């Protein structure tokens, strides 16, 4: 096992400033070339204190920012119009990338695809409850209403009446 000091947060491994034990191949082929970690020795212990202090400051700022974004997203309902065949089955599916674009267009919030928790692409019409996982463990729930073009036109006509 190789002992490394993480310079940046690594998903499912640790936060910056932590010393972790990883297999040599993972260190040699991924963490070290991408500058995500350095080999832990006496000199890096001083770096560890500085990294921990920076991480704590960044964590506080990230949590505030994430909570503000979560308040905007929480309870929001977005509408995605899709094409369907005569039996009501969708052509294709609604993907995470499309959901991210919907949120950007509707709420002017920049998210990454990894923030949306979706196990499988959405392949049915109706209302789907989704979760956004933001930094520092902050989550927000919102609804995605997938409608056929015909159903969307009908709902617009009902709103006008």
Curated annotation (Swiss-Prot):
Give the HAMAP family listed for this entry.
Ribosomal_bL9 (MF_00503)
Q: What is this protein called?
A: Large ribosomal subunit protein bL9
Q: Which Gene3D superfamilies match?
A: Ribosomal protein L9, C-terminal domain, Ribosomal protein L9, N-terminal domain
- List the molecular function annotations (GO) for this entry: rRNA binding; structural constituent of ribosome
Its job: Binds to the 23S rRNA.
Which terms under GO biological process does the entry name?
A: translation
Pfam families given in the database record: Ribosomal_L9_C, Ribosomal_L9_N
Keywords of the record, alphabetical order, are: Ribonucleoprotein, Ribosomal protein, RNA-binding, rRNA-binding
Q: Which gene encodes it?
A: rplI
- What protein family does this chain belong to? Belongs to the bacterial ribosomal protein bL9 family.
Q: Name one GO cellular component term.
A: ribonucleoprotein complex
- Membrane-crossing residue ranges in chain numbering: none
